Swiss-Prot record:
Entry protein name: Trigger factor
Role noted for this protein: Involved in protein export. Acts as a chaperone by maintaining the newly synthesized protein in an open conformation. Functions as a peptidyl-prolyl cis-trans isomerase.
Superkingdom of origin organism: Bacteria
Domain comment (free text): Consists of 3 domains; the N-terminus binds the ribosome, the middle domain has PPIase activity, while the C-terminus has intrinsic chaperone activity on its own.
Example of a GO MF term: peptidyl-prolyl cis-trans isomerase activity
One Pfam entry name: Trigger_C
Length: 444
């Protein structure tokens, strides 16, 4: 077998393969003999069919099978012979039967060979944050709000109060579907309703009626209402103000704090959890910033096969998330057309490029996972659970789960390696702003 290789692009090679006709003939004759032993043809006993009859009846199909098998086998032999780091399935082209050889072309994508630029040209912003006493107080107040009750008031409705009311909407004097409800409960300031709706209720008291004018947003989900002016008749039935629970023994017990330990122990526990959250948030932020800089500084071409595989992985991940949220029945209604490739392509390309670059950084720097950092990562994560020892043992005994942690830690080591040479600018942010950034990153 003869093979020549030419570069089609940075991530594709064209193989010109020539297979001797003698190889095809040998396999063809061998397969004819095997077929003759098992084939059933009227007028002949099994295994006694003459070779010329088998050749006449089955020769063409057997020959094509042999050719297909030889092309399949020889293309992979050629890839190994040429030491090509192939990805995806080869594309066979221009098959030609010559007198002395079967000649064909095969195009195959290859794993990118890249050189990573020096890190001293990278600019990375690294956020810093610290937990202040006011942040802890706000968090404890949020814990109280999660368990708040409502107390009826005769006063005017204000922001953060809960109002029970009836409403009836109309456009140009005509009622519309979904525009009416009775005993509807709404916390003012929650942003659940269209702009202007909640503002129109502020200041009303129980027993009062009012007509408010609002306009549906241009991008409202119901197209028949989008951008239209509407009137809503509001009848307030009840106004309630929030009542936070006292920080007493019963409240402290919810969080595993005794009355003797008191509010200071609760604050200490809350601060500890917030500090862990900040550490994780800052680590993820600087990792994102470093990797963004790495990808931006190194324009590389990646194989379409790798991108397609990553698109499928991300699509499957989204379906799994949907299943967890809405149950298996909802996921079964999904089909590929609902989640087209274009939805994932940009992120998939970035992910593949980043993976190639990180692998190269690991190889160049000869980085290996730091098991001490893996243990520290697991310890920190386990400390948020009721029984940390059980969590630590779980990761100790489950190699697959530990491998996932090792992958995260190894990424952290790559980030540290990049930051050691990059131009790093520290920027202090508040705890609240850090949380907002994390939420925005998760949502998009």
């Amino acid at each position: 077998m003869q093979v020549t290789t030419e570069a089609v692009s940075g991530v594709a090679r064209r193989l010109n393969v020539s297979v001797p006709t003698s190889r095809i003939n040998e396999q063809f004759e061998a397969r004819l003999k095997r077929t003759a032993k098992t084939v059933k043809i009227n007028g002949f006993r099994p295994g006694k069919v003459p070779a010329n009859v088998v050749r006449r009846e089955y020769g063409a199909s057997i020959y094509q099978e042999v050719v297909n098998d030889i092309i399949r086998d020889s293309v992979f032999e050629a890839i190994q012979q040429e030491k090509i780091n192939a990805v995806g399935t080869p594309n066979i082209e221009k098959v030609e039967h010559k007198e002395d050889a079967l000649v064909f072309e095969a195009t195959v994508e290859v794993y990118p060979e890249v050189e990573v630029k020096a890190f001293d040209g990278l600019e990375v912003e690294r956020k810093t944050a610290e937990i202040k006493d006011a942040d802890v107080d706000t968090m404890i107040e949020n814990l109280q709000k999660q368990r708040q009750t409502w107390a009826v008031t005769k006063g005017m409705a204000k922001k953060d109060m809960q109002v029970t009311f009836d409403f009836e909407g109309s456009i140009d004097g005509e009622k519309f579907e979904g525009g009416s409800a009775e005993d509807f409960k709404l916390v003012l300031g929650s942003g659940r309703m269209i702009p202007g709706f909640e503002d129109g209720i502020i200041g009303m008291k129980a027993g009062e009626e009012k007509v408010i004018d609002v306009t549906f947003p241009e991008d409202y989900q119901a197209e028949n209402l989008a951008g239209k002016a509407a009137q809503f008749k509001i009848t307030v039935k009840q106004v309630e103000k929030p009542k936070l629970p006292e920080i007493d023994a019963e409240f402290l017990k919810i969080f595993g704090v005794s009355e003797e330990e008191g509010i200071e122990k609760l604050k200490a526990d809350v601060r500890k959890n917030m500090e862990r959250e900040v550490r994780n948030g800052l680590r993820n932020q600087v990792k994102q910033a470093a990797f963004d800089a790495l990808v931006a500084a190194n324009e590389i071409e990646v194989p379409a096969a790798m991108v397609a595989q990553e698109i499928d992985r991300q699509r499957q991940q989204m379906v799994q998330q949907f299943t967890q949220q809405f149950g298996g029945a909802g996921a079964q209604s999904f089909d590929k057309s609902m989640l087209p490739d274009e939805l994932f392509k940009e992120q998939a390309e970035r992910s593949v490029k980043l993976g190639v670059l990180v692998s190269k950084v690991l190889a160049d720097a000869k980085l290996e996972v730091d098991q001490a950092r893996v243990d520290a990562y697991i310890d920190d994560m386990a400390s948020s659970y009721e029984d940390p020892t059980e969590v630590i043992e779980y990761f100790k005994n489950d190699a697959q789960q530990r491998a996932q942690i090792e992958a995260v830690v190894l990424e952290d080591q790559v980030v540290d390696h990049i930051l050691a040479s990059a131009k790093v600018t520290d920027k202090a942010v508040s705890y609240e702003d850090l949380l907002k950034e994390q939420q925005a990153r998760r949502m998009g």
